[in-house]
Amino acid sequence: VKEVSNDFKEMTIRDFKQLYDEMDGIADGCNANGCKTTVDEIIAWNFYYSIPYWYSTKSDSRNRKEGGSSDRCSAFMAVGKDWTTDGEIVCAHNSFTDFIDGQFSNIVLDLNPEKGHRFIMQTSPCWVWSGSDFFVTAKGIIGTETTIGGFVPYEKRFPIGYRIRHAMQYGNSLDDYCKILLHENSGDYANSWLFGD
């Protein structure tokens, strides 16, 4: 926890202050209700799916060239009159997770931030992003993803959780999503994103 927080806390405060404030508030709320935690633990917990990519840079060089994380999700989206009966979007997503962590992705969170767009997402307790990657925004954008297994390249830049949350909240178009997701892309939790509007 300390090592993850040491690597990402400063960046979180500097580049994603709103998310840091949310995580600090989550920690305060947990503590006030008898669940002892720290903002450092909340940052590490939000980085959970990115840890295998990040950790490969901390271990021997062989792990940076081989393997990578396994597939974790599968998704499907059909958009438009040529693909669906009524021209509306059809979207499906399933998660390939172990019971130990998958059991916690059982929250549907409706978030209406002071700035940006309201959105609904499937998520886990104390997360500021979906992680299970299924969401719908008030801007009319639906999103999900399918993981790219075996992807190894990683650079310490902005984690996927911060980038996709920023896109969900502030993205006005599919082009915005592309720009936000590609900006400072670290390569962590590699996946193919499917969006519809």
Spans of features found by a protein language model:
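N-terminal mature-domain region immediately after signal-peptide cleavage
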Residues: V1-D175, I180-D188, S192-G196
